Each structure stands twice: as structure tokens, then as C-alpha cells.
Design a protein with these regions (language model features):
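N-terminal secretory signal peptides
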Residues: 1-25
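Histidine-rich, glycine-flanked metal-binding segment
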Residues: 33, 43, 50, 55-67, ...
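Metal-coordinating catalytic core of metallo-dependent amide/deamination hydrolases
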Residues: 54, 192-318
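Alpha-helical scaffold segments that flank or form the walls of functional sites
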Residues: 134-206, 230-246, 491-496, 502
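C-terminal cap of metal-dependent C-N hydrolases
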Residues: 430-487
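His/Asp/Glu-enriched, well-ordered alpha-helical/loop segment
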Residues: 299-300, 345-440, 455-457
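Active-site gating loops and adjacent loop-to-helix segments of metal-dependent hydrolytic enzymes
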Residues: 132-162, 217-231, 285-304, 324-327, ...
Length: 508
């Protein structure tokens, strides 16, 4: 049995795909197949029942209008504006009005006194299957992550482990105020693994983008995984789970890094079923290969693609992203910690691109978005100050806290293809809303609402979370979650995974 950090280092990229393989030749969302139900049943059985089956406490009455009353409202919509004190009316899961003194006698009232009311955070890139491996690599580099998380653990994941990881990650996101999350899911060792991930997202109640990716293998050669159906199984997923884009969980394709010969067939598979694309690029020295120039030569770059990290892209590649209408996701905490390169915040801005933000891996970084905002806010300011100290007479402007908050909300919605539905508190949009307490010692007395959110708050300030008008968290507690069962689910999944991977779990 090996210790956790005994795994051999690897030269693969973060997606486990540096080698070039041969070219690859509705609203009723929870309509899972009998096979997927059988696959997942063991999870509920071993946990003493499903972790989410409990009479909700703090939930509102289904179908009844909700009036969020008397909060400091940050709509982040220029037409709507912000209000020192105002109300938000929700009808049919959508925002119907944002203004002071709304009268709605039949609505259920949520008192927002001493709270900031704002759009929920939007995460554009998180490997949610790793939710049962939190904190496993606090000191790890990118190479350590590949060797330990992907090769050692990922290759041994069962469908039950995938379910547990995704479910934990989704609940953690909701708890910290993230109302929409892109699951960059590269754990599809079999179709049963895929069904498990989809079911977990649906069961969690999160608004999610399921980005279907490759398998994990002990040698990193995912394209040789015998049980995997990637990327062609995306056609089944579209038909079985994602026949409509107007549902709580929607479909993307997570394209692997590597050569154009590897990537192009996955792009084609996505576009054949009308799915958007997300891909890691510009990661460390491995990212200095001019990949986007090569893909552009094949006319593969379009506005349907989100580019993650982008730390070591060249100027031409940045121009290609801008000119083709692509979006960018920056995971500043991970990028500085694991050796991806400097987070390209200023580079994106200089290129005319407003980035979105993402957590990336909970194996090494915290899952809350407040940390992500503060990381990029401080790094951009540090870069500007460094230029000034070096004698730059025309340095960039400092980011404002409002811009950072927009990166965490509407720009995330844009990258996830959902900016028409979420990201601001505009009447007609879905009611993805969070209420943040200002009567806590880390922020009171509150003097600047946007500044408080970006520079002072944390998950402990998240009082209430609504997704599509449904209350998911209230009074600081998740609604309808049995935590005793949840603890058992996590412990059993973790212990099973360590055993299957032949790794000794050393917790100190």
C-alpha cells in the first residue's frame, strides 16, 4: 500500500492528455435510465438512505410568490440599478420586480434586513468529481495533482464515488453562495460513471453545466480506456438528459488538451449536438505550444468556447480568443499555487476580454468564491503597482471591486451560456439570488456594499440562497439536507476510494 504522495510524477498536462493519440474515428431532467439508477442505488444504501431525502426546513411554499423585503440590493444591471433598500419579487421562479416598497399581499416574505441581496456567484470550471478528495493536496504542484488525483485515484473511481464527489461539491457550492457551476467532468471511465455524475447534479438542486469529458487511467492514456465512450456518448447524453437547453442542468463538452488531431474530433462531437465547449489552454510550459493558432488554422475557434487558465498564451492567441468571441475562465488561486503561470487578469483586460472566475480543484484550494474574488483583485493591483514602481508611465487602471463582482456573476453567466437567464437581478431572469448578512463581525458596520462582498465577506455571511426561485439555503442552513447521512456518505465514499486505490489515508 502506498502513501498519498508516493505516486510517480507525470509529464501529462492537467487534463491528462499531453500524448497525442491517433485521430478519433426537458425540463424532466431526472429521467435517468434503469442502469444509472442501479448504479447509484448502492450510494443511498450504504449511507443509510439518500443524503437529500428529508422534509425541508426553511423551504417556502411551492408555487407561491416570494417577496425579498428590505435588503440592500445590488442588481448588477445598469438599467435596474442598485438600491440602499429595496425589494425583489419572485413569481414562477423568475424575478418580476426590483424596486422599493413592492406590495404583494399573497407573497411569502423573506426579511432581508441587514442583508445584501445580489445575484448568485457563477463558477465556470470545477472538477466536481473530486469533492470527496478535498484538501488531499494542499502542498501539491500540477505534477503532483496529475499523479495523485488523476492517475492514482481517478483511475479507481467507481460510479458511486463519482456520485458522492459531485454531490458534495454541488452542495458545497450552494452553501457558499454559488448558484450556477460548470462541472468540468473528466471522470468518464464508463457510461455508468457519466450517469452517476448527471444524477448527482440533478439531485443536488444546483443550476449546473455538465461538461462531459474524458476518462482517467493509471498511465494517463485516456483514449485507450476500454470502458469509456468519450466523446461520442455525448449524443446519448443529449437525447437522454439534455433534450432542452431550458432546464436547470445543461450540456457542454470538456475538450482535452493535446494535439489538434486529438482535440478536433471532440469539438466536432460537441457541435454535432449543439453543445458548447470548454478547454484548458496555456497551462505552464506545456501551454507554450501555439495551440490556438493551430486550431484556428482548422477554423475550429468559435464563440461557443470557453478557454480556461490561459496563463502562457501568446499575444496572437489572445487576439484569436477576442476576435472569435470566446470567453475566458481564470482560476487565480490554483494558478498561483500549482505552477500554471501568473493568472492572466490584466492580459485578458488588455485584450478586450472580461474574464469569469472558477475554483478548479477542491483538492488544493477552498471552494468559496469570496477567496477567488480577493485573489484576482489583489493580484491585478499588485501587477499595476509593480509596473508603477518599475517606472511605467502608462500603467493599466486598477480593477474596481464592482468589476470583480461582475466577473464573479454576469461574466460567469456569459461563459456558461446563460447570461440571458441569470447573472443580474433583472426582471424576467430566473431568480438565482443570494442574501449576505452584514450584521457579522467580519463586516459590520457596513459602509460599502460592493466592497464588503469582495474584500470582507466569506461563506459564513451567506444566509439565503435561491436557485430558479427555490430556496436552497435559509437562515444559514442548507434546506432539506440530512447532515448525518451526508457525513456517512462522504466517509464511506472516501474510505472505499482509498482502499480501491491502495493508498493509506494519513490524515495528519
Amino acid at each position: 500500500m502506498m502513501n498519498l504522495h508516493d505516486s510517480a510524477r507525470s509529464s501529462l498536462c492537467a487534463c491528462g492528455a499531453c500524448h497525442s493519440p491517433p485521430a478519433l474515428s426537458r425540463r424532466q431532467f431526472l429521467c435517468t435510465t434503469a442502469a444509472s439508477v442501479a448504479t447509484i442505488s448502492a450510494v443511498a444504501a450504504t449511507a443509510g438512505g439518500t443524503a437529500y431525502a428529508q422534509q425541508p426546513s426553511g423551504a417556502t411554499t411551492p408555487g407561491r410568490a416570494i417577496l425579498i423585503k428590505g435588503g440592500c440590493v445590488l442588481s448588477l444591471d445598469r438599467a435596474v440599478g442598485d438600491f440602499e433598500q429595496a425589494d425583489v419579487l419572485i413569481e414562477g421562479g423568475k424575478i418580476s420586480a426590483v424596486r422599493p416598497n413592492i406590495s404583494a399581499p399573497s407573497a411569502e416574505v423573506i426579511d432581508a434586513s441587514r442583508m445584501i441581496v445580489m445575484p448568485g456567484f457563477v463558477d465556470t470550471h470545477r472538477h466536481m468529481w473530486q469533492g470527496i478528495l478535498r484538501n488531499v493536496l494542499p502542498d501539491g504542484s500540477l505534477d503532483d495533482y496529475i499523479a495523485t488525483v488523476q492517475k492514482t485515484f481517478g483511475a479507481k473511481y467507481t460510479p458511486d464515488d463519482v456520485y458522492a464527489g459531485d454531490y458534495f461539491s454541488a452542495l458545497g457550492a450552494i452553501d457558499s453562495g454559488v448558484t450556477c457551476i460548470l462541472d468540468w467532468s473528466h471522470i468518464h471511465n464508463t457510461p455508468e460513471h457519466t450517469d452517476a455524475a448527471v444524477k448527482a447534479l440533478g439531485d443536488s438542486g444546483a443550476r449546473a453545466v455538465f461538461a462531459y469529458g474524458n476518462a482517467q487511467t493509471v498511465d494517463g492514456r485516456w483514449w485507450e480506456a476500454k470502458g469509456s465512450k468519450y466523446p461520442n456518448d455525448i449524443a446519448r447524453l443529449r437525447k437522454q438528459y439534455f433534450s432542452s437547453d431550458d432546464q436547470l442542468v445543461t450540456l457542454y463538452l470538456a475538450a482535452p488538451s493535446g494535439s489538434p488531431e486529438q482535440i478536433l474530433p471532440t469539438f466536432a462531437a460537441a457541435r454535432d449536438v449543439g453543445a458548447r465547449i470548454t478547454i484548458h489552454v496555456g497551462v505552464g510550459e506545456r501551454g507554450r505550444v501555439g495551440l490556438l493558432e493551430k486550431l484556428n488554422a482548422e477554423k475550429a475557434l468559435k464563440s461557443d468556447t470557453t478557454y480556461i487558465h490561459c496563463c502562457t498564451l501568446n499575444d496572437t492567441e489572445w487576439k484569436l480568443i477576442r476576435d472569435t468571441g470566446g470567453t475566458v475562465s481564470i482560476a487565480g488561486y490554483v494558478e498561483t499555487l500549482m505552477g500554471h503561470g501568473n493568472p492572466p487578469i490584466q492580459k485578458a483586460i488588455d485584450s478586450g476580454i472580461r474574464p469569469s472566475l472558477s475554483v478548479d480543484v477542491e483538492t488544493s484550494v477552498p471552494n468559496d468564491f469570496f477567496q477567488q474574488m480577493r485573489t484576482i483583485f489583489s493580484l491585478q493591483k499588485n501587477e499595476v503597482w509593480a509596473r508603477r514602481l518599475a517606472g511605467d508611465k502608462n500603467p493599466p487602471k486598477f480593477l474596481t471591486v464592482r468589476e470583480v463582482l461582475e466577473f464573479a456573476t454576469i461574466e460567469g453567466a456569459r461563459a456558461n451560456g446563460l447570461d440571458r437567464k441569470i447573472g443580474t437581478l433583472m426582471p424576467g431572469k430566473d431568480a438565482d439570488i443570494i442574501l449576505l448578512r452584514t450584521d457579522r463581525l467580519n463586516v459590520m458596520p457596513m459602509n460599502n456594499a460592493v466592497g464588503a462582498v469582495v474584500t470582507s465577506m466569506g461563506p459564513q455571511n451567506v444566509d439565503t440562497v435561491l436557485i430558479a426561485g427555490k430556496v436552497m439555503k435559509r437562515n444559514g442552513q442548507l434546506v432539506g439536507v440530512d447532515f448525518d447521512r451526508l457525513v456517512r456518505l462522504g466517509d464511506q465514499a472516501r474510505d472505499r476510494l482509498y482502499s480501491n486505490a491502495n493508498v493509506k489515508n494519513v490524515r495528519l
